[in-house]
């Protein structure tokens, strides 16, 4: 949408990358890198790591990689190709003896992720130690494709072919048509929790960019399994309620939000319309300073037993993404490269603040 108005998106894109580079976002890794949790206890307690992109932590490192390369590709701007353009820096006042600083750019970060992927046999890079999630590796694949489009090469093709072969041992999907979620790296074993709606729709939304056949062959049964009918033709998605004692007892609408995104990506306009209708009828949408969003609301269900929960991730991002996306949006981004002719067309390339 708005292909001739890059100025509308350029500054917000830069601010989002700057926010992602803030230590408030990435310093959690020092704690998570020590492991010794329910799914990585076999590794024992590991030494803490400050560098948030050198090993594992793919959910964070891949978003930085793909965002920087996507910025370069969409705006034809090598801003993050400069040495040190992606620097992770913390300067504490009362501890740390000078702090920590890790300098990268879009090329060196892409190379680091590529070699990790190779070292792991293309199965994927772990998020938390020992936990290789299918979902979390998809943004890295998008980043590899953007790198290919900007600099040439075929990294994305190599990685996706290797990924399919590596996951053939476990299955990208289960026999029942739901997506597998993660493999424990040390044990080389598939963890098989009950199917999760968010996992089906989150992975489906992303992997559609390079493997649309597996998504579109399974989405109809997945949406039929998770949807619940609601008044006036609307519908909601059965939420994945964590067992007691497994993480903080927070409520959310991730399953609902990712179902909307996936419906938009696969072109299921009927499901998308029904989900958005439910959100507008029952999720208390708000207009504030030009922004339309759904405010946080705790508690899983209303007094009718229907989904009531809302969280910032869903209310601020996922439902907006679902509204703005076009059918096969990520797939087209991945497979239909912009040409030099696109950038030669007249365009709005700059604008004043506040417009």
Predicted segments with their positions:
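Boundary/linker segments of alpha-helical solenoid repeat arrays
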Residues: 21-28, 171-177, 231-234, 284-292
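Terminal, non-catalytic domain-edge segments
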Residues: 39-45, 68-70, 74-78, 84-87, ...
């Amino acid at each position: 949408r708005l292909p001739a108005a890059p100025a509308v998106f350029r500054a917000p894109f830069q601010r989002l990358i700057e926010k992602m580079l803030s230590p408030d976002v990435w310093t959690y890794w020092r704690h998570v890198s020590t492991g010794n949790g329910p799914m990585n206890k076999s590794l024992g307690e590991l030494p803490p790591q400050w560098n948030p992109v050198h090993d594992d932590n793919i959910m964070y490192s891949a978003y930085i990689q793909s965002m920087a390369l996507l910025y370069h590709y969409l705006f034809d701007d090598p801003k993050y190709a400069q040495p040190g353009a992606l620097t992770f820096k913390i300067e504490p006042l009362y501890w740390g003896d000078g702090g920590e600083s890790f300098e990268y750019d879009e090329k060196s970060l892409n190379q680091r992720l590529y070699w990790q992927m190779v070292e792991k046999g293309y199965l994927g890079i772990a998020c938390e130690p020992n936990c290789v999630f299918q979902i979390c590796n998809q943004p890295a694949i998008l980043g590899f494709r953007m790198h290919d489009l900007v600099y040439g090469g075929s990294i994305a093709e190599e990685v996706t072919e290797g990924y399919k072969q590596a996951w053939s041992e476990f299955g990208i999907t289960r026999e029942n048509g739901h997506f597998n979620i993660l493999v424990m790296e040390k044990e080389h074993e598939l963890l098989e929790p009950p199917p999760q709606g968010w996992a089906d729709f989150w992975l489906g939304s992303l992997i559609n960019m390079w493997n649309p056949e597996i998504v579109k062959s399974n989405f109809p049964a997945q949406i039929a399994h998770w949807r619940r009918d609601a008044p006036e033709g609307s519908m909601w998605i059965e939420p994945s309620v964590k067992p007691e004692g497994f993480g903080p007892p927070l409520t959310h609408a991730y399953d609902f939000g990712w179902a909307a995104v996936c419906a938009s990506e696969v072109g299921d306009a009927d499901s998308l319309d029904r989900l958005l209708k439910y959100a507008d009828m029952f999720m208390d949408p708000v207009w504030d300073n030009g922004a339309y969003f759904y405010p946080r609301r705790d508690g899983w269900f209303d007094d009718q037993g229907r989904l009531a929960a809302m969280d910032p991730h869903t209310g601020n991002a996922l439902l907006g993404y679902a509204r703005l996306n076009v059918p096969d949006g990520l797939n087209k981004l991945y497979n239909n490269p912009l040409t030099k002719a696109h950038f030669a067309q007249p365009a709005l390339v700059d604008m004043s603040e506040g417009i």
